[in-house]
Amino acid sequence: MTTSPSSAARKPFNRLLLTGAAGGLGQVLREALQAHANVVRASDISAMAPPAGKHEEVISCNLADKAGVLALANGVDAIVHLGGISTERAFEEILGANISGTFHIYEAARKHGINRVVFASSNHVTGFYPQDQQLDAHSPRRPDCYYGLSKSYGEDLATFYFHRYGIETV
């Protein structure tokens, strides 16, 4: 069996959206995701490096801006959602970036027919357990801060969007 050059170069996605692209993990994934998509659309509210060639787009977006997120997700095949505040802050800050922002990501996915989202959760979802206690998939969540609570909400939102709209989250 032979593989033609065009099929050998085929990538699973035409365009991937990466939120939180200015963060530590986001900066690493900007380059790594290019092996999986023809174009990586990198987004963050913070300043980012310029596009690294024709296979990358850089777009600034505040996840609390519903219309902005809807426009940001237009034309993408899947979303890698790392965006938001990654440390404990005042609830009002967490609300806009992490809770409303994650809702806006899933709504944009639904409205644009995007059926795959990668959502980064956190160990803070189970942070009130003693560190030496073993947990399994059935252990109740016990968020230890507003940030952990926002990630717990994101997990529930992902489950809701799967059952209601068929959007898969990993």
Q: Which role fits each region the language model picked out?
A:
Residues P12-H36:
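N-terminal Rossmann NAD(P)H-binding glycine-rich loop of SDR-like oxidoreductase domains
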Residues T19, S43, I79-L82, V117-N123:
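SDR active-site strand-loop-helix element
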Residues G53-D65:
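Rossmann-fold cofactor-recognition segment
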Residues L63-A97:
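NAD(P)H-binding glycine-rich loop region in Rossmannoid oxidoreductase-like domains
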Residues I79, A90-V117:
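NAD(P)-cofactor binding segment of oxidoreductase domains
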Residues G96, P130-T169:
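Catalytic helix-loop patch of NAD(P)-dependent Rossmann-fold dehydrogenases
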Residues H104-C145:
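Conserved Rossmann-fold NAD(P)-dependent oxidoreductase catalytic core, especially the SDR/UDP-sugar
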